[in-house]
Design a protein with these regions (language model features):
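A membrane-topology feature that recognizes alpha-helical transmembrane segments
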Residues: 1-225
Length: 225
């Protein structure tokens, strides 16, 4: 990676993390309480200093990994995932909910970023690849949800978001991202189930979101070329 990009990558990651952290209270206030879940505290109650520090740290690390591993023309496609997507994962971790509005915001940012990335790369097939991966990712998780009910429907929508982003890096990378995210989720679920009841809700979203980042580290840093 050229020296200017090496400097810009961490700066952009920190800047995005600062923006999403600053916006966290307003975004959480914007989210309605799930209507069919009984007594659930408003999402804005999550916006404690500790939670916001976690948002900043996780977003900065996620952005740093993505931008360090990829050429600058690829960065826009990842902006939504490493900012609002990270907030979405932390909300899921704390509440086991993946709020619809926040998911759609992340999808909108990802779609816009993919369009910008395709333009910067002068490659319209980036749009096609992102659309196909998003559809296949959501479709596969919908099928699993339909058959087993092993996770909530919010994870189906999240898979679509992830597919849109990882699809810009090609079929092999998209497969690796979903495989690694599913593997992390399975191992995490096994560890959690040892301490909790089998029917207790499990936050699968954070594991899915880790998949693309682990795939980047493995394919770009540990296995270059």
């Amino acid at each position: 990676m050229p020296i200017p990009a090496l400097v810009a990558a961490p700066l952009l990651a920190v800047a995005l993390a600062a923006v999403v952290t600053f916006a966290t209270p307003a975004l959480l206030r914007w989210l309605p309480v799930p209507p069919d879940e009984g007594e659930v505290a408003p999402f804005v109650t999550l916006a404690t200093p500790t939670f916001r520090a976690a948002v900043f740290a996780c977003s900065a690390v996620a952005g740093g990994i993505a931008f360090a591993c990829l050429p600058p023309a690829h960065w826009p496609a990842w902006v939504g995932l490493v900012s609002v997507g990270v907030l979405l994962g932390l909300v899921d971790l704390r509440t086991t909910f993946l709020p619809l509005r926040l998911t759609y915001l992340a999808v909108a940012l990802a779609a816009l970023g993919v369009a910008v990335s395709a333009w910067l790369r002068a490659d319209a097939w980036v749009l096609v690849s992102a659309a196909v991966a998003g559809t296949l990712g959501a479709g596969f998780f919908w099928l699993v949800w339909r058959v087993s009910r092993g996770f909530a429907f919010g994870d189906v929508r999240l898979a679509g978001l992830i597919g849109i982003v990882v699809g810009t890096e090609g079929r092999a990378f998209a497969f690796a991202a979903f495989f690694l995210g599913t593997l992390v989720g399975a191992l995490w679920a096994l560890a959690v189930r040892r301490r909790k009841a089998a029917d207790e809700p499990f936050p699968y979203g954070p594991a899915l979101l880790l998949g693309p980042l682990v795939a980047l580290l493995v394919t770009r840093l540990l296995l270059p070329g």
